[in-house]
């Protein structure tokens, strides 16, 4: 199962990758929305996307807009992983679920397993 992690903080991205790879998930990484879209055009479709909202360049909101209109990607589950504030509204604009930071590895795995 392939998961795309879109997160601008390299430490958070690395921690998520480590937890997922320990459970035999294949992980692709991206530091912003534009890079993630470019990877989606040339890489195999992920089974799930973990998405930060606040990123430089193309943020998570803009990324979701792009993914949800793409015929080959609109059904891929997106789990939003916001750092600050609430996740209000993310489900109505294309997110499948959300997981607020900070989170325990067990919580991350539970949310991911619900959607894979």
PLM features per residue range, with description:
Residues 55:
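Receiver (REC) domain active-site loop signature in two-component systems and cognate sites
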Residues 103-114:
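C-terminal output helix
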